[in-house]
């Protein structure tokens, strides 16, 4: 988030890893059902609601100077064109937004004693919000007067890029973390899912998150001083289920990690030291990432017959995609374009300058499915049995 004073100068800027709001989150915990009904999110110190409340309580001098609260992407647009604007899918992650009705929640803000006059206007993804100013042109090299188009949140832009725009469709963005989402045309609240706005009006998302799946893969790669191609080759030589070896590396269901499970690799007993090679570690983390995706599909009440559309760095691996199809027991559809979130944002930009009438038309014209992975019956049956024990 970025906060501006009345002169348009930044007085606070930090990503979601700023957890000073945790103390305020403790205060908010008694209001969690009310807060989640409005915002679609559980109480957490990383969201804007708790951070604003923390500043009001512990640093009132800064809080009193706030003129505008922005998400980081809103702030970048402000620097380019001077407009103070947010977008529903972006604002959804602030826990300050009425996700059902698409507006900042005065009801919620008043209930916790926060100001209601410090939030930007709301525009839809693909709408022009201004043009590049002379100052921004000098600093960036962009041409003065270039249209600035309202963007969308990264996962939602990925869904647009994959043309996942119908109620019931499923998608996973397998990057640093892996959000797992079901599109719905009505506002739903569920104990085990987040509810966010899609990048297209009239649609919402039921979202889980499998945790730091991409970081887990990178950590294992760096730990063994290897690369992803070698990891895959060695993992392929290991049987399904890794001879009983299991990996727990920050995986989550709907963004909530088990408080009783420590991270690491678990071996069956008795443990025969020579039985496990590097490939076991590699396959174990790939499989664990896929198990977490499946658990989140179940948490968001995914239809068992619906295919799973996927994008993100992890989906560059045929090996990963194949395991994912087997573990989830459903068709996995990849994309021809590797940078699918960038493609989704380009669709919004082209819509904003009039090349397409709306986001749906742009997605229909510009999105192309890649390779499709079918679950293998014998592997699917093995994982069904293994997951009962896992």
Where are these predicted regions, by residue range?
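Short linear loop/turn motifs
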Residues: 120-128, 234-237
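Active-site core segments that coordinate phosphate-bearing ligands/cofactors
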Residues: 22, 29-85, 95-106, 110-113, ...
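Conserved beta-strand -> loop -> alpha-helix junction used to position metal-binding or nucleic-acid-contacting
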Residues: 13-23, 27
């Amino acid at each position: 988030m970025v906060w501006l004073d009345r002169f348009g100068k930044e007085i606070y800027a930090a990503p979601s890893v700023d957890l000073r709001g945790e103390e305020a989150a403790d205060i908010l915990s008694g209001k969690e059902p009310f807060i989640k009904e409005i915002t679609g999110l559980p109480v957490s110190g990383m969201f804007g609601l708790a951070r604003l409340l923390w500043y009001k309580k512990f640093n009132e001098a800064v809080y009193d100077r706030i003129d505008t609260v922005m998400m980081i992407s809103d702030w970048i647009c402000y620097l380019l064109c001077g407009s103070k604007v947010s977008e529903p899918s972006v604002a959804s992650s602030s826990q300050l937004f009425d996700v059902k009705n698409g507006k900042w929640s005065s009801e919620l803000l008043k209930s916790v004693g926060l100001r209601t006059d410090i939030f930007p206007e709301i525009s839809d993804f693909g709408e022009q919000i201004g043009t590049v100013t002379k100052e921004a042109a000098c600093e960036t090299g962009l041409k003065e007067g270039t249209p600035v188009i309202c963007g969308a949140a990264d996962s939602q832009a990925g869904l647009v890029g994959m043309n996942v725009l119908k109620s019931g469709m499923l998608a996973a963005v397998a990057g640093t973390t892996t959000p797992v989402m079901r599109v719905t045309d009505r506002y739903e609240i569920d104990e085990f899912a987040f509810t966010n706005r899609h990048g297209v009006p009239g649609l919402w998302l039921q979202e889980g998150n499998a945790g730091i799946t991409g970081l887990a893969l990178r950590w294992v790669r760096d730990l063994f001083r290897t690369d992803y191609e070698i990891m895959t080759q060695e993992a392929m030589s290991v049987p399904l289920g890794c001879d009983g070896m299991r990996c727990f590396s920050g995986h989550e269901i709907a963004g909530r990690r088990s408080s009783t499970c420590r991270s690491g690799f678990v071996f069956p007993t008795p443990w025969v030291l020579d039985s496990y090679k590097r490939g076991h570690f590699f396959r174990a983390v790939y499989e664990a990432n896929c198990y977490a995706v499946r658990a989140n599909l179940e948490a968001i009440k995914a239809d068992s017959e619906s295919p799973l559309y996927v994008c993100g760095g992890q989906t560059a691996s045929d090996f990963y995609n194949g395991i994912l199809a087997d573990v989830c027991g459903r068709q996995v559809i990849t994309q021809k374009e590797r940078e699918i979130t960038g493609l989704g944002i380009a669709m919004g930009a082209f819509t904003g300058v009039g090349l397409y009438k709306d986001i749906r038309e742009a997605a229909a014209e510009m999105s192309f499915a890649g390779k499709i992975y079918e679950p293998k019956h014998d592997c699917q049956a093995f994982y069904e049995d293994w997951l009962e024990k896992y």
